[in-house]
């Protein structure tokens, strides 16, 4: 009698291990996840002028980025939303999106990225400098110099200059 119960026990164990648990089950079951459309992430920051990029990241074109501050508290609610969201503009970095001028953010971190710079104005450079306020002085100075160098190299490659 022990032999037929062993495969039956194994089959039951397999069925239970691939179940959809209450905590992580999307609406409509496991197969419905591909059908859900991306929505815009929750607003955050002063005057709700930013968007959540992760549980502790709030960015906006006018604001720059807040990392782990009081302005990002609302972004923790995003983990409890039933559908996925997407914030930001064009893709950048390995898995990020442009969050503010010159800043690329993923769900975990933000970094300066030349892909996210608005084309060539001094106001764009000033806005990128303003976004560095979350960094300490030495790191901010180094990143600022690297961004200026990258911008000069990019302008030097344009024909007719």
UniProtKB/Swiss-Prot annotation:
A Pfam match: Hormone_4
Gene Ontology molecular function: any one: neurohypophyseal hormone activity
Extent of the signal sequence: 1-19
Subcellular location: Secreted
PTMs per UniProt: Seven disulfide bonds are present in neurophysin.
UniProt KW keywords: Amidation, Cleavage on pair of basic residues, Disulfide bond, Hormone, Secreted, Signal
Cystine residue pairs: 20-25, 41-85, 44-58, 52-75, 59-65, 92-104, 98-116, 105-110
Family matches, as InterPro entries: Neurhyp_horm (IPR000981), Neurhyp_horm_dom_sf (IPR036387), Neurohypophysial_hormone_CS (IPR022423)
SMART domains, alphabetized: NH
Source organism superkingdom: Eukaryota
KW Secreted (keyword) present: yes
Modification Glycine amide occurs at: 28
Disulfide bond as UniProt keyword: yes
SUPFAM superfamilies hit by this protein: Neurophysin II (SSF49606)
Cellular component GO terms held in the UniProt record: extracellular space; secretory granule
Family indicated by similarity: Belongs to the vasopressin/oxytocin family.
Main function: Vasotocin is an antidiuretic hormone.
The name this protein goes by in its record: Vasotocin-neurophysin VT
Organism for this UniProt entry: Gallus gallus (Chicken)
């Amino acid at each position: 009698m022990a032999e037929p119960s062993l495969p039956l026990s194994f089959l039951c164990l397999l069925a239970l291990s691939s179940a959809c648990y209450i905590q992580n089950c999307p609406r409509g079951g496991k197969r419905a996840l591909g059908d859900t459309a991306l929505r815009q992430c929750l607003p955050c920051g002063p005057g709700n002028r930013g968007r959540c990029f992760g549980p502790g990241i709030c960015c906006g074109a006018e604001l720059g980025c807040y990392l782990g501050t009081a302005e990002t508290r609302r972004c923790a609610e995003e983990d409890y939303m039933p559908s996925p969201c997407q914030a930001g503009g064009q893709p950048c970095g390995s898995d990020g999106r442009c969050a503010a001028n010159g800043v690329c953010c993923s769900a975990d971190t933000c970094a300066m990225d030349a892909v996210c710079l608005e084309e060539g104005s001094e106001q764009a450079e000033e806005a990128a400098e303003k976004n560095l306020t979350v960094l300490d002085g030495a790191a901010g100075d180094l990143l600022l110099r690297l961004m200026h160098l990258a911008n000069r190299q990019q302008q030097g490659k344009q024909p007719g200059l």
